[in-house]
């Protein structure tokens, strides 16, 4: 999995490419934890995320809980396959997801 980050003031935008599974979720958790101090607005761009496993869902929930205490988190550009997983597991009700009818604006080009 590839992770790209952009910090603008108290806003952190993170784009993920590849698979967020049991192995890469550990890497992602460690990577993002180092960057959350002072962040009030976290944007996760999932346009290039092909797959998410339960370990990845756990990280998203953990991030949402953390950001609820220090600001907000929004997930955007969710692929159809990832959205299906979020819907089937009920996570789409727990996470702030930008709706698919919003125009896609890619954060990074991988």
Report each predicted region and the residues it spans:
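STAS-like cytosolic regulatory interaction modules
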Residues: 1-52, 62-110
């Amino acid at each position: 999995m590839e992770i790209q980050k952009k910090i603008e003031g108290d806003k952190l935008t993170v784009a993920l490419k590849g698979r967020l599974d049991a192995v890469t979720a550990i890497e992602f958790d460690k990577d993002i934890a180092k960057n959350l101090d002072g962040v009030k607005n976290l944007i996760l761009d999932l346009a290039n995320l092909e797959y998410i496993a339960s370990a990845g869902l756990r990280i998203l929930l953990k991030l949402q809980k953390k950001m609820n205490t220090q600001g907000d988190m929004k997930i955007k550009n969710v692929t159809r396959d990832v959205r299906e997983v979020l819907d089937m597991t009920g996570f789409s009700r727990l996470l702030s997801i930008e709706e698919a009818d919003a125009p896609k604006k890619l954060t990074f080009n991988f």
